[in-house]
Amino acid sequence: MKNNSAQKIIDSIKQILSIYKIDFEPSFGATLTDDNDLDYQMLIEKTQEKIQELDKRSQEILQQTGMTREQMEVFANNPDNFSPEEWRALENIRSSCNEYKKETEELIKEVTNDIGHSSHKSPTPKKTKSSSQKKSKKKNWIPL
C-alpha cells in the first residue's frame, strides 16, 4: 500500500481541522506514515481506532445539529453550504479517501491471493512410469 494516499488523507483532514480550529491528537497519522518495518496488524488496529473515534465525533455532531446521517450527507454534498476553501478541503478528503480505498482493496486482493496460493500448494505429484517406459520382455526373444 502506498503511504502517499494515506498521507494525503491525513493532510486533508488536518486542513479541515485547522479551518474549523479543531484541536486533534498530535500523533494522528503517525502510525500510518511510519516507514520502518510496517506492522500491518498494528496499522489495522490504529486505523480502526481512528475510524471509531471519527464515528463517535460524527455522532456527537449529528446530535448537536439534530440532523440524521442522510441529512448531513445531503448537506455535505452541497457546495453552497461551504466557503470555497472549505469545499476544496472537503473535495480533497473525498478524492484522497477514494484513492486510499482503491489501493486498500487492491492490497487486500493481493494478500488474499498470496495466502490462497500458498495454502493451496499441493505437494508435487510423484511421476509414475508409463507403460512404454516399463521394462517388458520382448516376444520371441532368445537370451544368449
Curated annotation (Swiss-Prot):
It comes from the Bacteria. Residues 118-144 have a biased composition (Basic residues). Residues 110-144 are annotated as: Disordered. Belongs to the chlamydial CPn_0742/CT_635/TC_0003 family. This is Protein CT_635. It comes from Chlamydia trachomatis serovar D (strain ATCC VR-885 / DSM 19411 / UW-3/Cx). The lineage of its organism: Bacteria, Pseudomonadati, Chlamydiota, Chlamydiia, Chlamydiales.
